[in-house]
A protein has these predicted regions:
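N-terminal targeting signals for export/organelle localization
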Residues: 1-52
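Thiol/disulfide oxidoreductase modules built on the thioredoxin-like
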Residues: 119-124, 130-171
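Short active-site neighborhood of thiol/selenol oxidoreductases, capturing the structured segment around
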Residues: 62-84, 90
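Structural microenvironment flanking redox-active thiols in thiol-disulfide oxidoreductases
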Residues: 84-122, 133-138
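A short beta-strand-turn-helix
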Residues: 45-71, 138
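Active-site-proximal beta-strand/loop segments in catalytic clefts of secreted hydrolases
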Residues: 75-77, 105-108, 130-131, 165
Length: 171
């Protein structure tokens, strides 16, 4: 019996070590789920005002969004694989539609890591580093699904939401 246990000990140690190598490396990462990519359009009569969007951006500048044009607000984090995957699509769309204001909201992330990713991928639209901005979307966005994207109409109302990775066809 002792020989069996001593023979199994290395296997148990390896198994324990491998289970400790889970997907996320922080509590912030593990508390989020990936959205399904579902698009929800909100009827005109059911639309509610989007929260005021202003604050410090990754570049250290203050940005204030003034309603009057359509806006796309993307919630992301640098550690989120689907977020990183959708960034080139958002960049391409922001270039195709210069009259649409694209913005990002960084959530539960280290701004230094996010700023490095934004610089590497050449994200030109502003990204807010204030998680408190998300509170204004609490009735619109799932609290723990990223990436998430909100479309704001010209009147400043939430017109649609995408829970999950944005694609060229979903936006």
């Amino acid at each position: 019996m002792r020989k069996r246990l001593s023979a199994l000990a290395p296997l148990l140690i390896i198994a324990f070590t491998l289970t400790a190598c889970g997907g996320g490396s922080s509590v912030a990462e593990e508390s989020f789920i990936e959205g399904s990519g579902a698009v929800t359009n909100i009827k005109l009569e059911d639309r509610k005002a989007a929260p005021a969007l202003s604050g410090m951006t990754l570049t250290g500048k203050t940005f204030i969004f003034n309603p009057g044009k359509v806006a796309v607000v993307n919630v992301w984090a640098s550690w989120c694989s689907p977020c990183r995957a959708e960034i080139p699509t958002l960049i391409e769309l922001s270039k195709q539609y210069p009259n649409v204001q694209f913005m990002g909201i960084l959530t539960r992330d280290n701004p230094v890591n996010a700023e490095a990713l934004a610089r590497r991928l050449n994200i030109q639209y502003p990204t807010f580093i204030d998680d408190a901005l998300l509170l204004g979307f609490k009735s619109t966005l799932p609290a723990n699904a990223i990436p998430s994207t909100v479309l704001i109409d010209k009147s400043g109302n939430v017109a649609a939401r995408i829970s999950g990775e944005v694609t060229l066809t979903s936006l």
